[in-house]
């Protein structure tokens, strides 16, 4: 039997509020690029709560589809908790890898990743590619190009979908359970 119209809407509103609260606490990783003259900046941004920063390592790998780790990375950043930041729910930490002049050696597949040494959480960003062409130009595919360094939670290529999938599974399961009442 289906829920009464008023009860179903109320239950759905409560579930959506729960999902919104939980997804705001998720740790996400995004990848982006910006070009400044001949320089190309590859940027890995991790969104997290300030208390989650301790023990987190953000790293960028090239051509490492199966074994991207801090040990095999091009560059890594160890996050530290900033006690000076109060009242902030979610903050971002960025790792920037700068290529001064893109050459054929830079062609390849890149990936931003992060790992927590405390909680065992591992985030893997989407793969993106740099292709150096014969004319001396290059293209970056798989993410959005940026002309200047501005980041917001809604931009970039959202990648750590595991926690978001768990939230959606919880939402669907809850709706099915409510319909069974």
Curated annotation (Swiss-Prot):
Residue span(s) of the pro-peptide: 160-181
PANTHER family: CD160 ANTIGEN
Disulfide bond entries: 44-112, 61-68
UniProt-annotated glycosylation sites, renumbered to this chain: 28, 137
Self-association state and partner proteins as the record states: Homomultimer; disulfide-linked. Interacts with HLA-G. Interacts with HLA-A2-B2M in complex with an HIV-derived peptide. Interacts with TNFRSF14 (via cysteine-rich domain 1); this interaction is direct. Interacts with LCK and CD247/CD3 zeta chain.
Domain Ig-like V-type span(s) in chain numbering: 25-133
Gene3D superfamilies listed in its UniProt record: Immunoglobulins
Signal peptide limits: 1-24
Domain of life: Eukaryota
Protein name: CD160 antigen
Swiss-Prot/TrEMBL keywords: Adaptive immunity, Angiogenesis, Cell membrane, Disulfide bond, Glycoprotein, GPI-anchor, Immunity, Immunoglobulin domain, Innate immunity, Lipoprotein, Membrane, Receptor, Secreted, Signal
Induction of synthesis: Up-regulated on CD4+ T cells upon stimulation via T cell receptor plus costimulation via CD28. Up-regulated by IL15 on immunoregulatory NCAM1/CD56-bright NK cells.
Tissue specificity of this protein: Expression is restricted to functional NK and cytotoxic T lymphocytes. Expressed in viral-specific effector memory and terminally differentiated effector memory CD8+ T cells. Expressed in memory and activated CD4+ T cell subsets (at protein level). Expressed at high levels in intraepithelial lymphocytes (at protein level). Expressed in both alpha-beta and gamma-delta CD8+ T cell subsets (at protein level). Expressed in umbilical vein endothelial cells (at protein level). Expressed in monocytes and at lower levels in B cells.
Gene Ontology BP term (one): positive regulation of natural killer cell mediated immune response to tumor cell
């Amino acid at each position: 039997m289906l829920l009464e119209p008023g009860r179903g809407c109320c239950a759905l509103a409560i579930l959506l509020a729960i999902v919104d609260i939980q997804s705001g606490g998720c740790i996400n990783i995004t990848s982006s690029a910006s070009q400044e003259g001949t320089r190309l900046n590859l940027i890995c941004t991790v969104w997290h709560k300030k208390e989650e920063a301790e023990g987190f390592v953000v790293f960028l790998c090239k051509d490492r589809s199966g074994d991207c780790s801090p040990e095999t990375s091009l560059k890594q950043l160890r996050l530290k908790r900033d006690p000076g930041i109060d009242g902030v729910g979610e903050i971002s930490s960025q790792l920037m890898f700068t290529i001064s002049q893109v050459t054929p050696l830079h062609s390849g597949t890149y990936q931003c990743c992060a790992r927590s040494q405390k909680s065992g959480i591992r985030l893997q960003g989407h793969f993106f590619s740099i292709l150096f062409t014969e004319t001396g130009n290059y293209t970056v595919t798989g993410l959005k190009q940026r002309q200047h360094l501005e980041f917001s939670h809604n931009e970039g290529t959202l990648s750590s979908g595991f926690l978001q999938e768990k939230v959606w599974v919880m939402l669907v399961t809850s709706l099915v359970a409510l319909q069974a009442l």
